[in-house]
């Protein structure tokens, strides 16, 4: 079913892998040999999550993670970690004494499902979930490639 690269056998916990009977149609979470769900909030489940073969228990579409809380947007600053990216959010902070703004940024680590392909500079939308590790509390819900203009707003380009 999936690429077995770990020492433990990887499988989705809600899927029965034996051959009792064949699966029915492609309803969310039912039938076939793959569990997937719609996370709601206006986000579509990626085709790779439905038809892919990856196993990721921290994926919001195929794993045991629910999205609740904040929905944020930012730019992928680093994609060097395994299934984790750093999202940079730029903002302006007002200095009362000088009546001016200064540029600031915050880095947010976010888990990215293997259903997405992301490069540095891509715009991403992330949603808050339960703590996935010591620092990761967000999950990538949508990737907007850097070259496209849909949904991307012009902001200052960094320091």
From Swiss-Prot:
SUPFAM superfamilies: Nucleic acid-binding proteins. GO terms for cellular component: cytosolic small ribosomal subunit. GO terms for biological process: translation. Pfam families: Ribosomal_S17, Ribosomal_S17_N. CDD domains: Ribosomal_uS17 (cd00364). PANTHER family: 40S RIBOSOMAL PROTEIN S11 FAMILY MEMBER (PTHR10744), SMALL RIBOSOMAL SUBUNIT PROTEIN US17X-RELATED (PTHR10744:SF47). This is Small ribosomal subunit protein uS17. The lineage of its organism: Eukaryota, Viridiplantae, Streptophyta, Embryophyta, Tracheophyta.
């Amino acid at each position: 079913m999936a690429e077995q690269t770990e020492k433990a056998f990887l499988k989705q916990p809600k899927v029965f892998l034996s051959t009792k009977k064949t699966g029915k149609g492609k309803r969310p979470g039912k039938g076939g040999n793959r569990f997937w769900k719609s996370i709601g909030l206006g986000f579509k489940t990626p085709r790779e999550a439905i038809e892919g073969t990856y196993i990721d228990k921290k994926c919001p579409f195929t794993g045991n993670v629910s999205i609740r809380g904040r929905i944020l947007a930012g730019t992928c600053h680093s994609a060097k970690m395994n299934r984790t990216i750093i999202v940079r959010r730029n903002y302006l902070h007002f200095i009362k004494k000088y009546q001016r703004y200064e540029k600031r940024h915050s880095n947010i680590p976010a888990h990215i499902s293997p259903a997405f392909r992301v490069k540095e500079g891509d715009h991403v939308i992330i949603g808050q979930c339960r703590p996935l590790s010591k620092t990761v509390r967000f999950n990538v819900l949508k990737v907007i490639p850097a070259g496209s203009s849909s949904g991307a707003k012009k902001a200052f380009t960094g320091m």
